[in-house]
């Protein structure tokens, strides 16, 4: 199983690794990686792998989880001289892309928490993007006028410069001690023995595997740009970052 270096250090930009296997000349599994695989509504990292023996470069186009491994899809430009099991490589992520997603992801936790607490909404999904992100939620009474207030509350929380802590707890601890996580933890597969926690101090505690900033001040601010009624009690909110 690939060691996910991003799990507890989201600020790593480069790393060294060994190729464990290559499938179809383009799907590369490493023993360790900083590349985030698409999951939880967060798009994958992109970047490049550089073979140490000859400096050959391989662009990483997409990253995903597959059968317990983290698979890096590389372009086909160097297929004739492609990566092979045992090759030593250095990996470099597109930091601007990663950092934007980190800010977006932490912002999503903040603004979703505000909607839950202030409106009584139930969050049903999310999708991060570079320019805008969305939060899906269930809410019976959809008072659009109140979302300007929710935006202000979210920005006030962001301005508090709250530390964002990442840590692992046992599945048992998550189920017993963190009431917010009980349902989520019980929904995990039996193989999961530890739960990764994202705690925004004074704001929210979540079970989350994504990448996040260290402090809410890095988000700078959020702006709600669109609200949609998706039928019955299903709602959707789009927001962007204020730079």
UniProtKB/Swiss-Prot annotation:
Cite the binding residues for Zn(2+).
105, 109, 208, 212
Give the note describing cofactor binding and stoichiometry.
Binds 1 zinc ion per subunit.
Q: List the GO terms this entry assigns under cellular component, sorted alphabetically.
A: cytoplasm
Fetch the NCBIfam families from UniProt: a_tRNA_ed_AlaXM
The entry's family comment says:
Belongs to the class-II aminoacyl-tRNA synthetase family. Editing domain AlaX-M subfamily.
Q: What PANTHER family does the entry give?
A: ALANYL-TRNA EDITING PROTEIN, ALANYL-TRNA EDITING PROTEIN AARSD1
Which protein is depicted? Alanyl-tRNA editing protein AlaX-M
| Species this chain originates from | Methanosarcina barkeri (strain Fusaro / DSM 804)
């Amino acid at each position: 199983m690939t060691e996910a270096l991003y799990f507890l250090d989201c600020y790593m930009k480069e790393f060294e690794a060994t190729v464990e296997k290559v499938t179809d000349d383009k799907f590369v599994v490493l023993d360790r990686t900083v590349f985030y695989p698409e999951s939880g509504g967060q798009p994958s990292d992109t970047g490049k792998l550089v073979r140490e023996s000859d400096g050959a470069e391989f662009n990483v186009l997409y990253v995903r989880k597959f059968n317990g491994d983290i698979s890096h899809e590389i372009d086909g430009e160097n297929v004739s001289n492609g990566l092979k099991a045992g090759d030593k490589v250095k990996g470099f992520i597109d930091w601007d892309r990663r950092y934007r997603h980190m800010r977006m992801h932490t912002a999503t936790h903040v603004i979703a928490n505000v909607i839950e607490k202030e409106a009584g909404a139930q969050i049903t999904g999310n999708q991060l993007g570079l320019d805008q992100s969305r939060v899906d939620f269930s809410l019976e009474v959809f008072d659009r006028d109140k979302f300007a207030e929710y935006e202000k509350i979210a920005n006030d929380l962001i301005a508090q410069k709250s530390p964002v802590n990442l840590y692992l707890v046992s599945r048992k601890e998550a189920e017993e001690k963190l009431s917010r996580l009980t349902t989520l933890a019980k929904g995990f597969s039996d193989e999961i023995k530890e739960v990764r926690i994202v705690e925004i101090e004074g704001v929210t505690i979540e079970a989350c595997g994504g990448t996040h900033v260290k402090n809410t001040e890095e988000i700078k601010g959020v702006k709600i740009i669109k609200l949609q009624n998706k039928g019955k009690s299903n709602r959707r909110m789009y927001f962007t970052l204020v730079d």
